A protein has these predicted regions:
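Non-transmembrane, aqueous-exposed alpha-helical and coiled segments at domain scale
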Residues: 1-308
Length: 309
């Protein structure tokens, strides 16, 4: 890889051992993907977790003196003061979360504790190069905002935040952002939740960048988040297009880069029913409780739940 002087200085340890470690791993990632250079980022999001390995790395980097050049937002943890007061977590859980919080503060992260920052607090501009981890984030920033991010892991996004660079490959390159699968949606898509089920059809859609035709004209931001999150978890999709809706697909021809789709897939009501059946309890058993993930909720679904209760 061809490195600039600043990048080489990072690799040589002139900015400290923490930044050196981060750059060393990033160069290795770039070489494994055939990247020719590193490019600067302006935004980042780290899928922070409180698990041992992730916390160990954050503490190690902080201990080596690493500081984030690009201040990242982070995924959810729990509110230390509130949960301690309520007494709903064990002392061990509290202490581990406190360590995670302390490590990311030392690194200079923005402790937003929100896994959907791309919808409000960390919104990239069209064409902006970013490093976003979190399964729902990468499809959203690429597809809906037209920004550019590869599917970063929590650790690689943290390394990018520290160095301020990412290797240039994959979805950072124009030629890799065109669709190659036409998905004809003949199923009835009636509400935001249906986009969850549509996204879980990844096994039938197959690997690539899908271009969806036949969707309703008015799609909420929550529905788009649902679609991208399930596409990424069901089939590792980093991007999709909706002609006439997403910024890089003003029409279907542009969505495919002027080429014909490699394959055409049709999604019917039967496909949605099959997916729904696969994630349901056998025999349609009653559920014991429902957990509403507030970090994924925006104002609209919160209001719906409020009025339903």
């Amino acid at each position: 890889m061809k490195l600039t002087q600043d990048q080489q200085d990072l690799l040589d340890g002139k900015f400290g051992e923490g930044a050196k470690l981060a750059m060393k791993v990033q160069v290795a990632i770039g070489e494994s993907f055939g990247a020719e250079r590193m490019v600067p980022i302006t935004r980042a999001h780290v899928a922070l977790s409180n698990q041992d390995a992730d916390r160990w790395l954050a503490e190690k980097l902080a201990g080596l003196g690493a500081k984030c050049r690009v201040r990242p937002t982070v995924n959810p943890g729990f509110c230390l003061s509130y949960f301690k007061k309520m007494g709903v977590v064990t002392n061990k859980d509290y202490e581990e979360m406190e360590r995670t919080d302390r490590a990311y503060r030392a690194l200079g992260a923005e402790l937003s504790y929100n896994c959907t920052p791309y919808m409000d607090t960390n919104v990239p501009l069209f064409g902006e190069i970013c490093a976003f981890s979190e399964s729902s984030a990468t499809p959203y920033v690429n597809s809906i905002w037209g920004a550019r991010s590869n599917r970063e892991g929590a650790n690689s996004a943290l390394f990018a935040s520290i160095t301020g660079y990412v290797p240039e490959y994959g979805l950072l390159l124009d030629e890799n952002r065109h669709g190659n699968i036409l998905v004809q949606v003949e199923a009835d898509i009636k509400c935001d939740a249906d986009y969850h089920i549509l996204g879980m059809c990844g096994k039938k859609i197959g690997h690539g960048i899908p271009v969806f035709a036949g969707l309703p004209k008015n799609i909420t931001k929550e529905a788009l988040r649902n679609l991208g999150a399930e596409l990424n978890t069901s089939g590792s999709y980093d991007m999709y297009h909706i002609p006439g809706f997403t910024p890089e697909a003003p029409d279907i021809k542009t969505a495919f880069g002027g080429k014909e789709p490699e394959r055409v897939v049709t999604i019917t009501n039967d496909d949605l029913a099959e997916v729904l059946e696969s994630i349901s309890l056998p025999g349609h058993q009653p559920i014991d409780f429902a957990m509403l993930k507030c970090t994924l909720f925006t104002g609209h679904p919160v209001r719906r739940v409020h009025f339903a209760l």
